Amino acid sequence: MALYRSRGIVLRSIRYGEADRILDIYTRDAGLVSCIAKGIRRTRSRFGARLEPFSCVDFMAYRGRTLDTITQAESLRSFRGVRERLDRLQAAAGMAGVLHALSGGTPDRRTFNLLYRALDALEKGEEGFGMIEASFGLKLAVLSGYAPRLDGCAECGGDVPGEGARFAPAAGGFLCRDCRSDAPPDSFPVPPGTLGRLRELAALPLAEAASGRGLEEALRRVVRAHVLAHAPGAASLATPAGTAGGRP
């Protein structure tokens, strides 16, 4: 078995057997990997709390057929503040689900860096976590080649009204007045200003996403619906928000 060293962020931790955990880790150089940390739930485990969900770690592991086996782990940043507040944790879990859906196992340092910056923004912020989650999902969709259309109607390219707009996930964007009269069944109305806020989120650095106010739930719904309609791994979003980083 080949031994390797990597850096990654723990996305999910699931109990396995009497003392082990199976971890999904998004790594900087290899994308998503699934590992087993043996004995991690024992009181005197050598891993301690270094492999908690959303921790950033350097680790060593042996490659296996289905699961790699972690032998060492060093904490680089625990992001403990993300786990200590439910609203932060829910946003982080939502981001993990979107990452699973859009990136899968594909390695991309830009994705790793985006996730790290998003967790940093969640931990340092006091509010606006839904905006951070929406910004992360939107930017990751762009990186992954699944960007929604924000410059006009998804069907005809015409102007989208500020009021009475509808979002059509399968079409990949918003609908103008003419096209919304024949809107697909998956479309839904959005509050005034939703398209404008999405355009702002696309342009703003992720660290500034929480500065906006209002429309958090609408933005999260739009981004999530878009990912569900287009991402190859969208089934990972079928679980309720909050379970992606949880510890059943």
Curated annotation (Swiss-Prot):
Keywords: DNA damage, DNA recombination, DNA repair
Gene Ontology CC entries for this record: bacterial nucleoid
PANTHER family registered for this protein in UniProt: DNA REPAIR PROTEIN RECO
BP terms from Gene Ontology: DNA recombination; double-strand break repair
InterPro entries (UniProt xref): ARFGAP/RecO, DNA_rep/recomb_RecO_N, NA-bd_OB-fold, RecO, RecO_C
Function: Involved in DNA repair and RecF pathway recombination.
Gene: recO
Pfam family, one: RecO_N
Record family assignment: Belongs to the RecO family.
Top-level taxon of origin: Bacteria
Gene3D superfamilies referenced in this protein's UniProt entry, alphabetically: Nucleic acid-binding proteins, Recombination protein O, C-terminal domain
Protein name (database record): DNA repair protein RecO
HAMAP family, per database record: RecO (MF_00201)
